[in-house]
Amino acid sequence: MNIRSPILAMTALATLAGCSDDPSAPEGTVPVRLSVAVATTVPITLDEVSAPLLARSEIFDDGTNQLVIDRAALVLSEIELEGSTSDCDLAGSDDEGSNDDGCEEFDAGPFLLELPLDGNVDQVLEVFVAPGTYSKLEFELDKVDDDDAAEAAFLQANPEFDGVSVRVEGTWNGEPFVFVQEVDAEHELYLDPPLEVADGGETRNLTLRLDISDWFRQGDGMLVDPATALPGEPNEELVEGNIERSFELFEDDDYDGEHDELEGDG
């Protein structure tokens, strides 16, 4: 996988404390970055797919139906890194940085997370943390309304996410579709092993990896039409559960989208 830092697309990075050599960084802290990746898949059917499409899409085929995902984006809020002896309160802060509950907040949100469908590992957020042990990332999958100024500003920039927490665009058997999910849900992802941040240590990176290959898939491996998973449709709960189970978090200091511990690097 390649590494990419989409600063222009992910404006939240610019609102944080800065890069690791920023002289304004709080003394005695260490930068921890949050990156995002999509689990790599090997499409079953490639012969009718052009190379430019492959560069920006995920393609799935069950032998009967073909699903092409051109865009997958989620809205997150209250993104916090929790210490091993802390208990994050997702509603406890509206500002990035350290919280009184011993947690470090990447972003209060709402934050638009565009999933990289081209094999890249995208750096999306950064926070400066105190030395210690960190065991969990917490965040909300956030259905946005305009209850406060931050949400109103988000919707002005992203009007297609009004009342939406997940948006997927692509084709189903060659026909364009737009899938949306209207779910508010809290997520807790544990680090195994926990992240050890040493005093004066180098920048660390955590990668949030999503496996989207099963988002629109039944237990028997057959794909489902995204139109049947829209709010109120018969496959709504199936796809909602698949998305909820697709998150994985791990230490990835070499930014290759793979678990450092399993590679023998951690």
Stretches found by the model and what they are:
Residues A9-M10, F250:
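Intrinsically disordered, low-complexity segments enriched in polar/charged small residues
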Residues M1-A9:
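Bacterial N-terminal signal peptides that target proteins for export
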Residues A12-L13, E96:
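Residue-level signal for mature regions of secreted extracellular proteins and peptides
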Residues S20-G266:
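A short, solvent-exposed, low-complexity linear motif enriched for acidic/polar residues
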Residues T15-G18:
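C-terminal motif of bacterial Sec signal peptides marking the signal peptidase cleavage site
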